[in-house]
């Protein structure tokens, strides 16, 4: 019983120490200045797959463009999504 209580108290203190914020953490202003990376090729590179004879070549790009209010889209030679 004493070992169980000791283990619970030790876990509590370890979790409390881990929950403290780091003093070196970046502020919101530092993050906004240039930490964002925008990859425009993700719909054409990663989501253009073929599985069991079904090809989803430009379907993700077309769905992305339809979601943005365009009439569709395609992947160009550089594998970048181009909306119509």
Curated annotation (Swiss-Prot):
Subcellular location: Secreted
Annotated keywords: Antibiotic, Antimicrobial, Cleavage on pair of basic residues, Defensin, Disulfide bond, Immunity, Innate immunity, Secreted, Signal
Signal sequence region: 1-19
Protein name per the record: Tenecin-1
SS bond partners: 44-75, 61-81, 65-83
Main location (coarse class): secreted
Propeptide residue range(s): 20-41
């Amino acid at each position: 019983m004493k070992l169980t209580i000791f283990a619970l108290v030790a876990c509590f203190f370890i979790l409390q120490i881990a929950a403290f914020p780091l003093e070196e953490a970046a502020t919101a202003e530092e993050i906004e200045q240039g930490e964002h990376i925008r990859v425009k090729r993700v719909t054409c590179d990663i989501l253009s797959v073929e599985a069991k004879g079904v090809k989803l070549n430009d379907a993700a790009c077309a769905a992305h463009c339809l979601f943005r209010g365009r009439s569709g889209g395609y992947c160009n030679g550089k594998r970048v999504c181009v909306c119509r």
